[in-house]
A protein has these predicted regions:
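Hydrolase catalytic cores
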Residues: 1-9, 101-102, 111-113, 117-120, ...
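Short acidic, glycine-rich surface-loop motifs adjacent to enzyme active sites
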Residues: 1-27, 48-49, 181-183, 296
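Subtilisin-like serine protease catalytic core
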Residues: 6-9, 26, 40-42, 55-57, ...
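Noncatalytic accessory or regulatory domains flanking protease catalytic cores in secreted, cell-surface
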Residues: 18-23, 127-188
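Secreted peptidase-domain scaffold signal
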Residues: 39-40, 55-110, 338-344
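Acidic, Ser/Thr/Pro-rich low-complexity intrinsically disordered segments
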Residues: 84, 94-98, 104-133, 331-332
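Catalytic-core environment of secreted peptidases
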Residues: 120-128, 229-282, 318, 340
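Edge beta-strands of jelly-roll/beta-sandwich modules across compartments, strongly enriched
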Residues: 186-197
Length: 344
């Protein structure tokens, strides 16, 4: 970005990476930083939507609204829980795993109790707000739970869980669960994200996954172009492509581009076929560069960058077969079309 400013030239930035850590609502420090870059100079930032669409690494639960606290003669009894309205989130931990993280994100106004339950039935309680605790699982393996607080950048609250295997052993495999006991619920929505596919095995995942809001961060940032992948020969969105919308309801992905079995330059020379949204995003980054060249460099529209360029790409996107309502959680506004994106 600094070099583009020094050269007084527009710049298209491609970010073909992402992870699951954060509230996915555009409000984390990282998401805000990426969004703010939009106003630094004449640029367009393009971000891959991630490959978590069918990875079973996201789920969502809705807790019943109301006051479920237990009261005694002396008032509210914080040591007791009401199990009548409890919710369990189950997930499979595959053989051979050495590390796993799960984040639960919820509204700070909601109060609940959380227990992690092992395959053997052992229960591990969430600590007090603003603190953390580490439990021993055997073989020097540990489970850490951190009960977070809001930050200056987000009103959401995180409960962070991390499993770490001891030296020479793996984590206890089987069906684990996260038991949620509501105390005082006003909004009730809890989103849980697991480590991304690079960090966990393919057999590890939630038993009741939710494919929506599986975009990786920073594809959830506000003022960027987020790109999913579709298969060119079938004209269908790729199953792995990260789905929207964001946790705050913002439209993402913006659009989709070819991302299955794409012939591309290989490290060390030559060519190879690659699949993923990180392959789809460069198509859109190139399109963004062409739009800014047409507008800024050639003098047709010196303000064609940032959100204006994004708007042109959205309008120019073509529909995909079988999808009638746009924006769509998987395809956004449709598939990339550079020709239709250039204003006539």
């Amino acid at each position: 970005m600094r070099k583009a400013i020094r050269l007084q030239q527009p710049i298209a930035v491609n970010l073909s990476f992402g992870n699951n850590y954060g509230p996915h609502d555009g409000r984390s420090l990282f998401e805000n930083y990426i969004s703010e870059l939009n106003g630094v100079w004449k640029n367009m930032i393009v971000v891959a939507a991630g490959n978590e669409g069918n990875a079973r690494h996201h789920t969502q639960v809705a807790l019943p609204k109301g006051d479920f606290r237990i009261y005694g003669n002396g008032g509210f009894d914080g040591s007791r829980i009401n199990s009548d309205n409890s919710t369990e989130v189950e997930f499979a931990l595959a053989e051979g795993e050495r590390a796993l993280t799960i984040q639960l994100w919820k509204s700070y106004v909601d109060r609940l109790e959380l227990y992690v339950v092992s395959p053997s039935g052992e229960r591990f309680r969430m600590p007090e707000e603003g603190t953390g605790v580490r439990y021993m699982l055997g073989g020097d393996s540990t489970l850490s739970i951190v009960h977070g607080t809001p930050t200056p950048y987000t009103i959401s609250q995180e409960i962070y869980m991390e499993w770490t295997a001891g030296e020479g052993v793996t984590l206890p495999a089987g069906i684990w669960s996260i038991a949620l006991y509501p105390r005082e619920i006003r909004e009730g929505v809890c989103n849980l994200w697991m480590s991304g596919i690079e960090a966990s095995g393919s057999q590890t995942g939630f038993l009741m996954p939710v494919t929506n809001t599986t975009l990786t961060i920073p594809a959830t940032a506000d003022r960027i172009v987020s790109v999913g992948a579709y298969q060119a020969d079938t004209m269908a969105v790729a199953p792995f492509s990260g789905r929207g919308f964001t946790a705050s309801g913002q439209t993402a992905p913006t659009l989709v581009a070819p991302g299955v079995d794409i012939l591309t330059a290989a490290p060390g020379g030559g060519y190879a076929r690659r699949t993923g949204t990180s392959i789809a995003a460069p198509f859109v980054t190139g399109a963004a560069a062409l739009l800014m060249e047409w507008g800024i460099v050639r003098g047709n529209d010196v303000e064609l960058y940032g959100e204006k360029g994004k708007a042109y790409l959205m309008r120019g996107a073509k529909p995909l077969p079988g999808i009638t309502d746009y924006p769509d959680v998987a395809a956004g506004y449709g598939r990339l079309c550079v020709e239709q994106s250039i204003p006539k």
